Amino acid sequence: DTVIMIRSGYRKFITYPSSYLLKKGCYMPSVDLLELFLTLADKYDMKFYFGLYDSGHYWDTHDLSYEIEDNKYVIDEVWQTYGHHKSFGGWYISGEISRATKGAIKAFYEMGKQCKEVSNGLPTFISPWIDGKKAVAASGANLTKAEAVSVEQHEKEWNEIFDGIHEVVDACAFQDGHIDYDELDAFFEVNKKLADKYGMKCWTN
């Protein structure tokens, strides 16, 4: 019943003909995928979540605040052009982090606030990953790493992040594939406890 576009663009490749991003040097897509997906979601009574634009600056600098500026324009532009679709059901704030990251609280808060303000309060969510032992670079030779996050540190860092964003972010879907199977219960318990504390929904990914 739900379809989520995890990002509307990455660096120069975009899913819809954004006049703002085209001026910034992005490539014109051959098909307006956003219009296509929303039309199909309308047809099949599905709820569509729009994923924000990822400029790539965060991956290069580890500072999430770089993503705020472009998305100010993207959020307004997308809602004005596509917000009439009955299936447009919410927003995915696509900066994917795992730990207390520079600029994260400010970025999630500002982007979440704008998404909700333009769309009369449609829901927003994030999907960070848990920095477990399997969270290694795909380009590297190692399958695991020694310096994985502890449950206690994960709880401490995400308590601080949720405290700063819960007013404008409705749900959090932690990516759990980076931790070991026998760690799932402990992390899930903490995630649910934190979500309940701040009135957020706890999803998984």
List the predicted regions and their residue ranges:
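Glycan-processing catalytic domains of CAZymes
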Residues: 1-205
